[in-house]
UniProtKB/Swiss-Prot annotation:
Enzyme class: hydrolase
Activity dependence on pH, as recorded: Optimum pH is 4.5.
Domain of life: Eukaryota
Protein name, per record: Purple acid phosphatase 1
Keyword GTP-binding: no
Keyword annotations of the record: Disulfide bond, Glycoprotein, Hydrolase, Iron, Metal-binding, Secreted, Signal, Zinc
Organism annotation: Ipomoea batatas (Sweet potato)
Residues linked to a glycan: N118, N180, N311, N433
Length: 473
């Protein structure tokens, strides 16, 4: 009963401070973004090579393109990655310490290089540090001599049902001036995201001639100002596939998997493109739109096994990340996620997934809680219906990439679509406790804290548990 009262007060307070409605259906925003006349070629749209955000750090063999992600299942590990021009002694070492201790520790990473067409990468270092203390600020140092560089990160709180935590949400960002605006906008948001859930499509280097992998390097330097200090949880998108038989590249995901590791083995996954983590009060499952997912496939078998491990008494918020949206009312990529929806949606509903975040479509859209699990080829019930056990689907592929906005929408707006707008921006998912979380979407043209769309979410699992408790009283 106490949890019910706390949850209701949280909801009432949220409505007073931010008077938004629950799932207002059918809104197509009237806001029209002033176009920067997106051009067809990445060379014409991406920031110039000599942009200050692409600057190479000074010093001999200086570490660059520094980024971190969660390094284990529970949140006590971090993977630190960086590149150096040369594989010199000391280049592969991380020195780290907590702000509460003067004792410094050292860890050694692994080093890899890869080739892609006529490009050979720099030396790419990955160092996994485990057994860190929860909810603690750590500093870490890379490099040596005049090339030393220092960064920091904060580990998440220990997983627990009422642990508050704030996630930033970014997708399909690329490296245009709009991309820079999106990242700046996120950094300035007073909500202060503690980690980023990234919905895929990083550098868009494949839009350059021969998939110019130098654009992976510029993107790594551009994003470092955020991802070196807070973990980004990676989802692979179609622009990470890099399958290009016309230039002799037959192995997919080569640049992405060499540069951006994930803690997939910690969740029993045999592939870095799908995995799961626990972070504070959230259990996050990352799926791959561009890997096999039909019944009996490795991803399918892993996914169904992972769902059985979710403990909603420990991590009540069940979140799924997948690049291609399963519900999408834009003309761009319309119904591309339909096959995956048919396979996975029954599990989303049965296990009461709270929210599914996607990218791919270069605009913003939020759905009602709907499902289409009743459909089969015999009964032809192919219209989504309201379903309180279903997740909210949010498409946030509006990071600012060189392909521009997806502005053409299907008409009329389908009943499952609650809000849609063709603008660049980012999102915030703010978990308050086991029962309530607040989602907000922030378009780049507004002040960083202005909410162009927002929604209070009632946890699917605990809502049903509380309802059962109330009915039994």
């Amino acid at each position: 009963m106490r949890l019910v009262v706390v949850g209701l007060w949280c909801l009432i307070l949220g409505l007073i401070l931010n008077p938004t409605k629950f799932c207002d259906a059918g809104v197509t925003s009237s806001y029209v973004r002033k176009s920067l006349s997106a051009l067809p070629n990445a060379e014409d749209v991406d920031m110039p090579w000599d942009s200050d955000v692409f600057a190479v750090p000074s010093g001999y063999n200086a570490p660059q393109q520094v980024h971190i992600t969660q390094g284990d299942y529970e949140g006590r590990g971090v993977i630190i990655s960086w590149t150096t021009p040369y594989d010199k002694a000391g280049a592969n070492k991380v020195v780290y310490w907590s702000e509460n201790s003067k004792s410094q520790k050292r860890a050694m990473g692994t080093v890899v290089t890869y080739k892609y067409y006529n490009y050979t990468s720099a030396f790419i270092h990955h160092c996994t540090i485990k057994d860190l203390e929860y909810d603690t600020k750590y500093y870490y140092r890379l490099g040596f001599g005049d090339a030393k560089r220092q960064f920091w990160f904060v580990t998440p709180p220990k997983p627990g049902p009422d642990v508050p935590y704030v996630f930033g949400l970014i997708g399909d960002i690329g490296q245009t001036h709009d991309s820079n605006t999106t990242l700046t906008h996120y950094e300035q948001n007073s909500a202060k995201g503690q980690a980023v859930l990234f919905m895929g499509d990083l550098s868009y280097s494949n839009r350059w001639p021969n998939h110019d992998n130098n654009r992976w390097d510029t993107w790594g330097r551009f994003s470092e100002r955020s991802v070196a200090y807070q973990p980004w949880i990676w989802t692979a998108g179609n622009h990470e596939i890099d399958y290009a038989p016309d230039i002799g590249e037959y192995q997919p995901f080569v640049p992405f998997t060499n540069r951006y590791p994930t803690p997939h083995e910690a969740s029993g996954s045999g592939d870095p493109l799908w995995y799961a983590i626990k972070r504070a009060s959230a259990h996050i499952i990352v799926l791959s739109s561009y890997s096999g997912f039909v019944k009996y496939s490795p991803q399918y078998k892993w996914f169904t096994s992972e769902l059985e491990k979710v403990n909603r008494s420990e991590t009540p918020w069940l979140i799924v990340l997948v690049h291609a949206p399963l519900y999408n009312s834009y003309e761009a990529h319309y119904m591309e996620g339909e096959a995956m929806r048919a396979i996975f949606e029954p599990y989303f509903v049965y296990y009461k997934v709270d929210i599914v975040f996607s990218g791919h479509v270069h605009s913003y859209e939020r759905s009602e809680r709907v499902s289409n699990v009743a459909y089969n080829i015999v009964n032809a019930k192919c219209t989504p219906v309201s379903d309180e056990s279903a997740p909210v689907y949010i498409t946030i592929g509006d990071g600012g990439n060189s392909e521009g906005l997806a502005s053409e929408m299907t008409q009329p707006q389908p009943s499952y679509s609650a809000f849609r707008e063709a603008s660049f921006g980012h999102g915030i998912f703010d978990i308050k406790n086991r029962t309530h979380a607040h989602f907000s979407w922030h378009r780049n043209q507004d002040g960083a804290s202005v909410e162009a769309d927002s929604l209070w979410l009632l946890n699917r699992y605990w809502a049903s548990e509380d309802a059962s408790s109330m009915s039994a009283m």
